[in-house]
Amino acid sequence: MDAFTAGLLQRIRTTETDLTRARDEGDDFLVEVEQAELDDLRRLAAEHGVEVGA
């Protein structure tokens, strides 16, 4: 696994964790921010052929 792939997957995992935390805390604004970031990261992964878990 190259550095780009490893870094991208790490950012996705971190964002998923942050999204869960925002949901648990009831922070609707932060949920929207984190969801948008996650969507962007998943799009980037797809564009580069990086497989991401569901």
Task: Map each language-model feature to its residues.
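C-terminal-biased regions
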Residues: 1-54
